[in-house]
Regions:
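Conserved N-terminal beta1-alpha1 strand-loop-helix module at the mouth
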Residues: 1-208
Length: 208
């Protein structure tokens, strides 16, 4: 079975970035959305991104930010990938000359095929749980059986994942990557070493 990549999102400190990287994360995510409890300052994000080892991706998460706001972050922070969680259209997402993934909050009536067709330039599509008024980080799972098996974009699966359910999620969805935030935390924005290690071990166990 192909190896499923792991992204640890909502990193707010260099120490937590180090925990994720040491445990084997393929990517870390930093949230540039001021209403999130996991919001990170540009100065801290710069410190983290400048200390990243080779072959670990840094991902910047934005929610309905302006062109200027995203550009300001990019001027100071080395990001390999952008992640858009709001109502951004393809023209906006693709305007920064960076690979990007588009997040979708999945509801029963969501037409994922149609949504993928609206973002042909995306590197992948992130599927998250829907909760009214919350653009991500809900800590809740959704019905993975709603995901078509033939989506044209690589799937990044999010939404309520933790060490106890991620193996089942990988088995059912077979995503390119899984994205975890609250499932490896002590409190919002504060990661737990043991939970990160257990999560990554659970993902790696699906290859056996």
């Amino acid at each position: 079975m192909r190896r499923t990549r792991v992204k640890v999102c909502g990193i707010t400190s260099a120490a937590d970035a180090g925990l994720a990287i040491t445990a084997g994360a393929d990517a870390i995510g930093m949230v540039f959305y001021t209403k999130s409890p996991r919001h990170i300052s540009i100065s801290t994000a710069r410190e983290i991104s400048s200390a990243m080892p080779p072959f670990v991706s840094t991902v910047g998460l934005f929610v309905n930010s302006s062109q200027q706001e995203v550009s300001m972050v990019l001027a100071d922070v080395s990001l390999g990938l952008l992640q858009f969680h709001g109502d951004e259209d393809e023209s906006f997402c693709s305007s920064f000359n960076r690979p990007y993934i588009k997040a979708v909050r999945v509801k029963p009536e969501t037409n994922l095929m149609q949504l993928c067709s609206q973002y042909p330039s995306a590197s992948g599509i992130l599927l998250d749980s829907y909760k009214k008024g919350i653009p991500g980080g809900t800590g809740e799972i959704f019905d993975w059986n709603m995901i078509p098996g033939d989506l044209p974009l690589p799937i990044v699966l999010a939404g309520g994942l933790d060490a106890s359910n991620v193996a089942a999620a990988v088995s059912i969805v077979q995503p390119w990557a899984v994205d975890v935030s609250s499932g490896v935390e002590i409190s919002p924005g504060k990661k737990d070493k043991q939970k990160i290690e257990q999560f990554i071990q659970a993902v790696e166990g699906t290859r056996q």
